[in-house]
Amino acid sequence: MAIAKKIFLLVSVCILASVASAQNLTILHLNDTHSHIDPERGGLYPGRGGVIEQAAYIDSVRVADGKENVMLVHAGDFGQGTSYFTEMNGDIEIDILNAMEYDVVCLGNHEFDNGIDELARRLANLNLPVVCANYNFAGTTLEGLIKPYVILEKAGKKVGVIGLLTDVSSVVDRNIADLLKYNNPAEVADKYAYMLKVEQGCDLVVCLTHLGYEGESYTDVELAAATRNVDVIVGGHSHTDLNKVDKVYNLDGEPVGIVSNWKWGLTVGNLKVNFKQNLLYGKYLDLLPEKVFSLDGSWFPYPAYEDREGWNKVLGKSAVHLINNGVKYLDYKWQIVPATSYLEYERTGERKIMENPQSANRVALNTLMLAELAEGKGRFIDQLVDGLWHLSNSPTWVLSAHLPRQKTGRSLPDPREQLIDLGSGALGAQVAVAWHFFNKTFDKIDPVISYVIQEAVKKQILDPYLNTDEYRPNWWLGFELKPGQVVNNWNPWCNADVILCFLLMEKNQERLDQALRQSARSVDKFIEYIKTDGACEEGPAYWGHAAGKLYDYLQIMNDASNGRFTFFDVKQIKDMGEYISRSYVKDGWVVNFADASAKLSFTPSVIYNYGKAVGSEEMMEFALYNLADSKKNNFKEPRPLIWNDAYRALESLRYIREMDSKVDALNERISSGESYDSVLNSLRTSVPSHVWYPETEFCYMRNNDGWFMAAKGGHNNESHNHNDIGTFTLYVDGIPMFVDAGVGTYTKHTFSKDRYTIWSMRSDWHNLPVINGIYQHDGAAYHSADVEVSFKKSASRMTLDISGAYDEESDCKSWVRDYHLDGKVLTITDTYSLKARGAADVENFLVQGSVYLPGDVTPEGYPVKKGETVVINQGVRMMIKYPVMLIPSIETKELSDPRLTNVWGDSLRRISYTSSENAPLSGRYVFKITEF
């Protein structure tokens, strides 16, 4: 007892000295201390461990970080193992746990060594919670002493801790085993984690386990991979000296951190936890008492339809352009989507037959609305009424490809169930904006018009959004994701459109508050998934729908709250915006991992507005850059956006005069004698030469020699995922030399179980190896490791181990790929180690240009030698020097899909370098790429 008292006094003194700290949570953790009270007296670890050293360290951390920011936990087996336990019946261990003020402990199997009744006696003296969720202790003396979980307040956050224990049936007395029923840890953890995260609003969910990291019947690694909503696993039982945080991806593709701290208390584990932000939801709750969001739509930052002077100021010379476009639609015939067009999706996978007429109707609606706002004479009103009447009486606004989420599982709309998708949300926003501007005019014709429009938006958008039973079909909310689903661009896209409908049309304050609260919680899910580095893993082609739609949502909420709900000063939001500029190569080419296209045209107003909001000169200059006209060697004046997005059409007017003024200044520089290229290049001087996105694991390297290389790590369950861990693309002077094909036109196979039968999704059609005959596998469990980057003035490098992206059948222990860019030389080195050899390795490279293998003669007359390959594309000539033991070959992929041919032409070529089937189990493949 003297030792316990000594520790208690030490702790008390240190607590008095502690100071509050504004940092995230520190989890101090021990496990399997096994009654090792004193430092080790001999053996392999003399002098190490002991509770006095532990207490001193724990108290030093509590002082440094603030006790309220530190959580001390024990992952089981605190008893049994030395004479302290046998002579004092485990009482001193309980005294020590109390004295050191542990926050929570879980049970280990050795806690049962002296029987259940004896364990109950000891636990009755423990002044802290004991957790174990996968056993039922009802009817035993442990009933009431052990909880399945506990919620702690730490670092100003709610932390849920779930306890889990290994199957003890084979390691405890038979009589004890018969009393206890073991339940699957993953099933139990999944249930409680959902309850803690979703229902109880915990900011962090920790599984405190005594399962074992490795070598046990069910491990922490298996637990992480089989659950959702668990953030951290603090484990014990296997005595694993895990000297770093292991990262395992869960069913949602989210990383779960696993830690375990060896044995005997030789060290104290220290884990720093960064809480997920709840950025928007927290702000909304702060503003809720003030009722800053009004019901009357007066917040909308555009003049009323009747305010002709206001519209003249907004539009200026753009009015004529809008009116002229509207005239073209005065005789437009509103298109009907027949039932068979919906059914065509499930019959053949064809979606355009349904989408094209709906898209045409949406463009017509936008064009007519903008024309009437510009002219203000009523000329377009009847045609608007016809369109809105037609759309309001449609059975659904959802696209046929998304209707199988109905309970029927069919692509024909079921009027008994309303979902919200990209199509319905966007059309709902259009209808809401039109109603906002013209409802008084409609009422003069017949009040029934406004009533029908309001009822349609309520039925199609407002009611389904508030119906919590629809969380699963409306998966994009992020509240109930299926295994493997991730939060992607649907989230901000749908939420922006839906919240615009509510803020313009909802007349019930309680319903509006519910929608605002739900949208803030939902969009937080997207911000968390995007990661703090700001990269868009879906690629630049989706930036406008991902970060761009997040901007729309934030701008709507900012305007509707009179600037109170604002996040444009948050670094992550700015970084997400600048990603679009930094992923740009030249001449419309962009970095195009995943489903993104390699060539894009941009919407300058979206980029400019976003940049203006976050204070990014880089983005505003990039917007102006995209107004350049290389044929005329000048810059085009910005035009209002006429498309099928009502909000963005209006937003394109927000800074149109400011953009116009800047374009005039650029053209004046050209008129004054500065070259067009000089003016154009001046708009890209703020772009950094090298960019590293550490969480998403994207790396961009560009140099003064005109080389731009992009490479990636990550995992194979990213949004719009391709199996492409470790791939790269290379451009020289804006010419694509090593490419990523992208994706063809979407069909029902694109987002189905057949996705990875599509050639462009597979790793063997990326710039990647086939290892020992095996391709990369899809899923969050297949990921990169040990990623390192270095940027120097003379050269840049990225290194990563991609072996984890391949099935175990590859027998690959490690495959470390190294990219080294030095001037006009890119060296790719693959260093590998296999357990066994079953097939050849194949190194693949995908190119657009012509390929010349050894024995060929280039058009310039160069005879290609052994160990060389020449690639020529649009005047750029490159030499690949490869290991001579590899056999080169070419396969041409003929292209017919317009989405691919519009970028690449009629074909791409894959260069494959194949090893012997008896190649060594370890070795190195080096490829040196130079201009030729």
Stretch-by-stretch model annotation:
Residues 1-24, 276:
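Bacterial Sec-dependent N-terminal signal peptides
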Residues 23-275, 279-282:
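Acidic, metal/ion-coordinating pockets
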Residues 299, 349-361, 408-424, 470-492, ...:
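Solvent-exposed loop and edge beta-strand segments that line ligand/cofactor-binding
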Residues 326-337, 384-402, 449-477, 514-534, ...:
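Long, well-ordered core segments of solenoidal/helical folds
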Residues 372-385, 434-458, 502-520, 557-573, ...:
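Structural helix-adjacent loops and short alpha-helical linkers that scaffold large soluble proteins
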Residues 404, 425, 746-932:
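CBM-like, beta-strand-rich accessory domains located in the C-terminal region of large
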Residues 410-539, 552, 654:
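Active-site lining segments of carbohydrate-active enzymes
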Residues 548-737, 792, 904, 918:
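Carbohydrate-active enzyme catalytic cores, enriched for enzymes
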